[in-house]
Amino acid sequence: MKLEVGMYVRYKPLLSSKYVKINKIKEIEEKENCLHIWLEDKDLITEKYLIKASYNIIDILEEGDYVNNERVEEIWKEIVLVGQECRPISFNNIKSIVTHEQMEQIAYKLDH
């Protein structure tokens, strides 16, 4: 896959392999036979840490991620179905995303 500025990426940050993030490519530099990929939030990654990349953010979502604070139940080509009612959300209506790995990392778990 050829990476280009403006693509969305699902990746593991260099400093933490405990969770997965989603961001957008801001700049790409080739240095010593290695691509350095700068993201909008100032993260720097290499291809080794990429999981998926696409111009359509829906392509890199996974079931269990959270879109607009609701759990993704199903993913179709142009929409995601979220929440218990499986409401459709299109690309243009996506405002925020939390990956299921991020949610697992930050969740407070009760021992009963």
Outline where the language-model segments fall.
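Structural boundary micro-motifs
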Residues: 1-112
